[in-house]
């Protein structure tokens, strides 16, 4: 299979890792030869008003164990995306389509692709279901 891009990049929290996370990583890898995943640090999540169930070092290890992922780095700020795209010579930035349009500012540095989310599953939904039990 001839892939369109050489280096892909995506970012996320990846708390309570589920099939939707796996699907987006698989589809992101299908676009390129090498996939870099930035996992949001606990400190960055607190800045965004999010509290994770799983600490960042564990979330990074989980993502690193996925066969579609070639490199895992911590994400510590919003500005890091531009820095990383330049630093790693990223050809394609990949996100779920729930973020559609939010990362178009990266188009001056690389292609930006929004992939459809896996329906019926999200970390927010899982947290709500667990809270109700």
Please name every model-derived segment.
Residues 1-133:
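Nucleotidyltransferase catalytic core that binds NTPs
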